[in-house]
Amino acid sequence: MGLSDAEWQLVLNVWGKVEADIPGHGQDVLIRLFKGHPETLEKFDRFKHLKTEDEMKASEDLKKHGTTVLTALGGILKKKGQHEAEIQPLAQSHATKHKIPVKYLEFISEAIIQVIQSKHSGDFGADAQGAMSKALELFRNDIAAKYKELGFQG
């Protein structure tokens, strides 16, 4: 299920665009996640009280968390699938502390692709979208495998 060198290059090329504004992209990803899948908001004590998009946009905590999420994801993507060391602590915290189901990782993956498409459509054609989808699926599958090792049925 791995990606070819050419696919990784497509992923990293568009990720460079994301990195030009990690806070803005991260905020947009979380807002899209919470609006599209309101049940995910319940996993975030710091954000549960945010009911409207305007409230979400005004939240510095939400923007900071979006930055954290996309910074971590960028570090994982740059490993081109060799991300064991990065995945382990992430799976540990998301399984044992946050109890984030794999389904929610699918939801945020969708949000990431939608945000990149809306902000960088000229640099995110079908090939790049397909490569990013594969990279995010690889990430999710590896997280799911770690969840299983940890006994989390997420």
UniProtKB/Swiss-Prot annotation:
The keyword Oxidoreductase applies. It catalyses: Fe(III)-heme b-[protein] + nitric oxide + H2O = Fe(II)-heme b-[protein] + nitrite + 2 H(+); H2O2 + AH2 = A + 2 H2O. Keywords: Cytoplasm, Heme, Iron, Metal-binding, Muscle protein, Oxidoreductase, Oxygen transport, Phosphoprotein, Transport. O2 binds at H65. Its EC number is 1.7.-.-, 1.11.1.-. Heme b binds at H94. The modification Phosphothreonine is found at T68. This is Myoglobin. The gene is MB.
